[in-house]
């Protein structure tokens, strides 16, 4: 980049079409966040009306994560074959329909199924919107593109909390889900008014890629076996999270079965680069395990342990959600300045200083609690805004939407486990202690996985012939592609 270009403010590097593409995707992600977090806000009301245990109620949050891996795969492949725009519109329609169905749900099973539909739509929205914006913006601004986009989810959560405080006390919890149908109108507007992503257009010129992940898995020579494994994974996840299994050994066996199936899919679809894909799933798994206990159960903690009324809960959640949204934007600037991995590690380390005080302070001073949550979520949750850029850099354009969608949403099963683990621990400890302990300990795992660039490192150990040495999105070198002590300029850029 020339000196003259560097002196131009970053936002002047973007034209009107690129800003319009971002605005449309950001609004879609805001609506996604709004619809997705509604269940967390009304969890106690739903639990009381349906007569659910705490673990059953938490499984309604988990349900959306169970179907995400399949939604990420299918809608991601749609984005790779037909373009990012169509996949994004389809995703919005799916999660909106699921939200409306929640409002009509007569009982636990019906609502669980509706949450499965929401999960599929959410997964598609994540993969398609992220690749759409990242591929539409200049390479040197793509951490900002990722961070700014993901902030929309947190803003959606803030809006949902405010709507909750106005709607639920007057019209009840079902009315909140009826509002979630509005995004379908937005989806119809999107279909006609936004351009296709630049990278996808340049790569294909209107032609479909040779093979997507769906082609490989469900139209290839192993299609029958893969369909059977897909059904087996869906059944196993159903029994793990909705079957009320009491035997931990059976749950563990079913979990290992699912892991084996997902690894098999990754090996088939990515070939020699499967170690990278598997490690990306592990990174995302632990990212959800450290962050989602708080995301999912914070409203319950505020209402039960701290005995806050709905208005106070909404105020505290505003600080939390707004902090995460600001953190996504800050993370985008940090990522373009320090580099994606270094920014991630520094932000998580800083967040560790705040997690214990958040749950130790109690509920006497709402404003202090709100400020602590703002900064903790800004540093700990907000930095996840650059996670799509981090993951997408390991995939070529042909498989980026499906690769990002599948790896991210398989790892997102950590979000399904997180609230249930938190609820189980809370049966022996108070909920605040359980949430703080989980988040504090598991954040360090993520710091190590990202800081050491374990996807590249494990790829180098197991299948070095397929090692990617540079980020496919911004061209920067992967630190894990060389042994410790090796010079970065020894790296040779690869295409695969």
From Swiss-Prot:
Keywords: Cell inner membrane, Cell membrane, Membrane, Sugar transport, Transmembrane, Transmembrane helix, Transport. This is Sialic acid transporter NanT. The keyword Transmembrane applies. Its main location: membrane. GO terms for cellular component: plasma membrane. Belongs to the major facilitator superfamily. Sialate:H(+) symporter (SHS) (TC 2.A.1.12) family. The lineage of its organism: Bacteria, Pseudomonadati, Pseudomonadota, Gammaproteobacteria, Enterobacterales. Catalyzes the proton-dependent transport of sialic acid. It is a multi-pass membrane protein. It catalyses: N-acetylneuraminate(in) + H(+)(in) = N-acetylneuraminate(out) + H(+)(out). The keyword Signal does not apply. It is found in: Cell inner membrane. Disulfide bonds: none annotated. GO terms for molecular function: carboxylic acid transmembrane transporter activity; sialic acid:proton symporter activity.
